[in-house]
Amino acid sequence: MKELKNDRYLRALLRQDVDMTPVWMMRQAGRYLPEYKATRAVAGDFMSLCRNAELACEVTLQPLRRYPLDAAILFSDILTVPDAMGLGLYFEQGEGPRFERPIKSMADVQALPIPDPEDELGYVMNAVRTIRRELKGEVPLIGFSGSPWTLATYMVEGGSSKAFTKIKQMMYAEPQTLHLLLDKLADSVIGYLNAQIKAGAQSVMVFDTWGGVLTPRDYRDFSLQYMHKIVDGLIRENEGRRVPVTLFTKNGGQWLEQIAATGCDALGLDWTIDIADAKRRVGDKVALQGNMDPSMLYAAPARIREEVATILAGFGSGNGHVFNLGHGIHQDVDPEHAGVFVNAVHELSAQYHGR
């Protein structure tokens, strides 16, 4: 294995010394970049882009050519797992993801296969191997999956949702059906992430985008429990290094202590929580990733720098901070503003890391 030229991101996740705060952006390979749009046009559509290892590699590397980012993240989608289970993923123009065969009953859940990550999801592993090769040890590669709860919301609702009525109906009227679905999804995600690690991912992240729509008790029983199972089932050492695991529940700021108790290495934070408060609560147990509002990138460059400075000061001195947005970058952001953000993190953070 090539030694990493820049391991700042991995070191920060393990709360080890770094010379400056590492930074990457959720959805850093995406529609805000004109070069991404050009590559997607070549692919034809989103899933064709995901399924072509060379093109998925190209869009993964595009933001690294523009910005001095400290990590690359696999270009893929959280819905690859339910798609591999046979639900028939497709994308409606302007509507987002849909499933041809949503989950409606216990029989549907019982019939679901657990996908073989090197078979039905082999195209993802090919992308991981291709990206890892082309990175040439410059920065680490992040693999990822959706959380069981978040994947289940799409599978039961049949796509995106605002009210989550179908899955909440299942949760309250047929909890055993939902628990079986979540358990199968947890097993699928463990296999999927471990295959990504074996293929070359040096860190993994679980996106629990919709955990924040649950009551505290339901969050514990229907989301956190299954993320805990995933953390317990993951490969944590590979290529002579620890493989850090980050859990991110959007709107999950009230549950940081419980998430930190899963044994993960880092928590993702959205912008609705003060990072100083998060550090006070769980900074002795886990690293923190975040947490600038992605909409701040619409602001003037001076205002972006000011916000970066505020968040860095909130975390303060010491290790264990990976700077990121609190969610994905918006598609109509000026790429120059993203560059201001990345450069500001490096420039303004060195003072907090004494050498």
From Swiss-Prot:
Membrane-crossing residue ranges in chain numbering: none
InterPro entries: UROD/MetE-like_sf, Uroporphyrinogen_deCO2ase_HemE, Uroporphyrinogen_deCOase
Residues annotated to bind substrate: 27-31, 77, 154, 209, 327
Disulfide links within the chain: none
Family matches, as CDD domains: URO-D
One annotated GO molecular function: uroporphyrinogen decarboxylase activity
GO CC, alphabetical: cytosol
Cell compartment(s), UniProt: Cytoplasm
Reaction equations catalysed: uroporphyrinogen III + 4 H(+) = coproporphyrinogen III + 4 CO2
UniProt EC number: 4.1.1.37
Single GO BP term: protoporphyrinogen IX biosynthetic process from glutamate
Name of the top EC class for this enzyme: lyase
One protein family per Pfam: URO-D
UniProt pathway annotation: Porphyrin-containing compound metabolism; protoporphyrin-IX biosynthesis; coproporphyrinogen-III from 5-aminolevulinate: step 4/4
Keywords: Cytoplasm, Decarboxylase, Lyase, Porphyrin biosynthesis
Annotated site residues (Transition state stabilizer) in this chain: 77
Keyword Transcription: no
Cited PANTHER family: METHYLTETRAHYDROFOLATE:HOMOCYSTEINE METHYLTRANSFERASE RELATED, UROPORPHYRINOGEN DECARBOXYLASE
Function: Catalyzes the decarboxylation of four acetate groups of uroporphyrinogen-III to yield coproporphyrinogen-III.
Subunit structure: Homodimer.
Protein family per UniProt: Belongs to the uroporphyrinogen decarboxylase family.
Designated name of the protein: Uroporphyrinogen decarboxylase
Species this chain originates from: Aeromonas salmonicida (strain A449)
